[in-house]
Amino acid sequence: MNNEYKLTKFVQAAGCAAKMGPGDLKQTICHLTPDDERILVGFDTSEDASVYQINESQAIVQTLDFITPVVDDPYIYGQIAAANALSDVFAMGAEVKTAMNIVGFDRKNIPKDALEMILDGGNSKIKECGGVLLGGHTIESPEMYYGLSVTGMIHPNEIIRNNTPKIGHVLVLTKPIGMGILTTAIKRDLLELNLIKDCAKIMASLNYLPSKMMRKYEVSSCTDITGFGLMGHALECTNNSITLNISHNDVPFVKEAFDFASNDVIPGGTRRNMKYVEDKIEFLPNVSDIYKALLCDAQTSGGLLIAMKKDDAKEFIKELEDYSFGYASIIGEVIPRTHKAIIIN
């Protein structure tokens, strides 16, 4: 792992922890009302990507995402940023077709050869899922950021939404949480190299395989977990008819993230998430403040949160384990609406 460039030292916040908080974002875009009957999925429902119908059998899925460095290795940072951007297409159940680079380059602190490695890392992930890089746009910036604009394709009848989970379905999370806390620890030089490598491997792994595998089953909803944390994105999956009942002990997380959170190594994005969800979620008394921070932790390139039948979920998890994707767990269930959108027990 190449740490000589110290990419994380020249940014205020790492990765998706730099994301604008969900409350502020909603206020900012609420007046934007695109009107076109071919828009199958817009930004009015907090979906992962937008979908625009081309004809009876084809729709394009569009998204973009870019992040500041979460690790110091340029190539791995490029991989993580690309995996994070591509994930929105996978969450919709779509296939990636093309991508374009989005770059803000900090020429003052970062050498040009590091940028070449970042772009190579990103391109490796685009190729891994069968996509093609078509170009991009680069500006000079006081802070480094990199990501992708991504276009995918899907049949209009096969779109997987995030806010349609069925009562009786269970919730599967495919990656452990805690990455916001751990990338903050990286930025503060608190993490040992072996743990940095483990975190980087998790963040750089694509959600492509879980996305392809879940399509074999009856999936009622799916989203990916990124800057708003598990709780923020789970809230986007709720509606007036259902409540998500989640067991905090069943949520996979990286152990060291708990330890760092206990020592107040908590990113600002995570604190904003905690503030946003506090009146929307019931945390039962057995859920500690440290677990609350973990559940709200701002993830970068997190896993998929999928609602599906319990028997299917068990088979799905076993399939992922067979492909060495061993973090997936059933973390809760969808129940009829109670007094809160989410209950954490």
Swiss-Prot record:
What's a single GO MF annotation on this record? selenide, water dikinase activity
Return the annotated site residues (Important for catalytic activity).
19
Q: What class of enzyme is it?
A: transferase
Q: Which CDD domains match?
A: SelD (cd02195)
How is the co-factor bound, per the entry? Binds 1 Mg(2+) ion per monomer.
Reactions that this protein is recorded to catalyse:
hydrogenselenide + ATP + H2O = selenophosphate + AMP + phosphate + 2 H(+)
For this protein, the Enzyme Commission number is: 2.7.9.3
SUPFAM superfamilies of this UniProt entry?
A: PurM C-terminal domain-like (SSF56042), PurM N-terminal domain-like (SSF55326)
Q: Which UniProt keywords apply?
A: ATP-binding, Kinase, Magnesium, Metal-binding, Nucleotide-binding, Selenium, Transferase
Biological process annotations from GO: selenocysteine biosynthetic process
Query: What Gene Ontology cellular component terms go with this record?
Result: cytoplasm
Which Pfam families does the record match to this protein?
Answer: AIRS, AIRS_C
UniProt: ATP binding residues: 19, 45-47, 65, 88, 136-138
State the Gene3D superfamilies in the record: PurM-like C-terminal domain, PurM-like, N-terminal domain
Q: Please indicate if the UniProt record lists ATP-binding as a keyword.
A: yes
Obligatory cofactor(s): Mg(2+)
Q: Where is the active site?
A: 16
Q: Which residues bind Mg(2+)?
A: 48, 88, 224
The record ties this protein, via NCBIfam families, to: PRK00943.1 (NF002098), selD (TIGR00476)
What is this protein for, i.e. what is its function? Synthesizes selenophosphate from selenide and ATP.
Please report which protein family the annotation says this sequence is part of: Belongs to the selenophosphate synthase 1 family. Class I subfamily.
Assembly mode: Homodimer.
Name by which UniProt lists this protein: Selenide, water dikinase
